Amino acid sequence: MRKFNKPLLALLIGSTLCSAAQAAAPGKPTIAWGNTKFAIVEVDQAATAYNNLVKVKNAADVSVSWNLWNGDAGTTAKILLNGKEAWSGPSTGSSGTANFKVNKGGRYQMQVALCNADGCTASDATEIVVADTDGSHLAPLKEPLLEKNKPYKQNSGKVVGSYFVEWGVYGRNFTVDKIPAQNLTHLLYGFIPICGGNGINDSLKEIEGSFQALQRSCQGREDFKVSIHDPFAALQKAQKGVTAWDDPYKGNFGQLMALKQAHPDLKILPSIGGWTLSDPFFFMGDKVKRDRFVGSVKEFLQTWKFFDGVDIDWEFPGGKGANPNLGSPQDGETYVLLMKELRAMLDQLSAETGRKYELTSAISAGKDKIDKVAYNVAQNSMDHIFLMSYDFYGPFDLKNLGHQTALNAPAWKPDTAYTTVNGVNALLAQGVKPGKVVVGTAMYGRGWTGVNGYQNNIPFTGTATGPVKGTWKNGIVDYRQIAGQFMSGEWQYTYDATAEAPYVFKPSTGDLITFDDARSVQAKGKYVLDKQLGGLFSWEIDADNGDILNSMNASLGNSAGVQ
């Protein structure tokens, strides 16, 4: 055996250790505790004014710090997202910080890597969330169908739509996760308001606190720009799937983003207007105001990327809406111009994003109101016309009673003006393409009490003393409650086969409720197919137990699906 003297051995060992140190990669860094959720569109969870609520950026600002407890720091630090370099800079010692931007939403596995000429050493991965309003950072919201909802495939090529209301998350406790989304092609979010104070949004004053809420939302925002009426319900209220204190988007919008991940083919549209929010439309004969509105809708869609277009619910061009002081013969022309300009804006947005955006509108089914607008011209800008073939009669009139959502006129009043068929015929007579017309169904009833003086056992031929006790508001009863409570006992169910309309009547009190049920919806669906119309939609999804939506799907020819 060869022998080394002690000084030489020490020299060799020292030389070897020095070479190993020079050839080693850096030590392993540790990501420090810190924020792991970032957002491209930032939401202030305490704000009430829209201008303060939302901050839109092109990319999320991400920050990460790290420590090195052992080993060499190397010369370069890198941030890896899902294994790809997102940032690099000098490695300066036992700790470091990187600030960088991420322009695409999602969930990323983030690592810090320290590098030198001999290699890189990466930290353990930490998940970060980069939130964007397309919902790409969220797990799909796919919940079991509730109540009587059965699964259907959307394979008929027809529209199956329904409205979901912002305020439904309160007393109704109807949240987005309860929507039977697989049974819909279109979900309309009611309602998006248009900013404006006294003289512009006076109809809102009939609902306690609603006008004041809009003024808070629109603080510092120009009149005739869109906003969010209730930021808490829309973005700040914890809901299933968006419950953490640091979730960037909560509320209805947060859940709708997740719903879109589960049902990417579902078209989700913000509906602007509605009965008490239509006043600003009457001022849009002024092009400056109209341009400001259209521009703000574009900004809204750019901000809230889960939306697929816009629905305009102007009630009603020409007047006879909530505000009796509003309405002009020029409204029809304004409506056509508004549709044309919205379409041009949406086409421009499509060119920028590569997405297709729909333009729809909810309109009255009364011929008197239809004739105020050249829908044969407006249709060229529109994807669908949602014909509100409901609210024909109700306790707003105690002397003239009738079916609120009938397909045809009843035998006892064959000259009834307000029917679904008459509304459709008025549009077709103008030259509107049948496929553009989507017929409305009611997931609620309207009713009276004290009905008396009627003839031939037909309560509609009498008069009433007031509105029937309602589910949430007197005069209006959810279909769910009608089906569950008013189909037996003293209540008498009758189906008017001529009108294709059901009603229930309680002779002892004179309570009378007119509504849609599975049979009347089946008749509407058959009519849609016979006339080659666009489909069916409903107001409003929280009031149904599944019977109405099931019938909408079945009557249009959608086949049974699986959950």
From Swiss-Prot:
Family matches, as InterPro entries: Chitinase_II/V-like_cat, Chitinase_insertion_sf, ChitinaseA_N, Glyco_hydro18_cat, Glyco_hydro_18_chit_AS, Glycoside_hydrolase_SF, Glycosyl_Hydrlase_18, Ig-like_fold
Boundaries of every GH18 domain copy: 158-559
Active site residues according to the UniProt entry: 315
Organism listed in the record: Serratia marcescens
GO molecular function, one term: endochitinase activity
Catalysed reactions listed for this entry: Random endo-hydrolysis of N-acetyl-beta-D-glucosaminide (1->4)-beta-linkages in chitin and chitodextrins
Signal peptide interval: 1-23
Protein name: Chitinase A
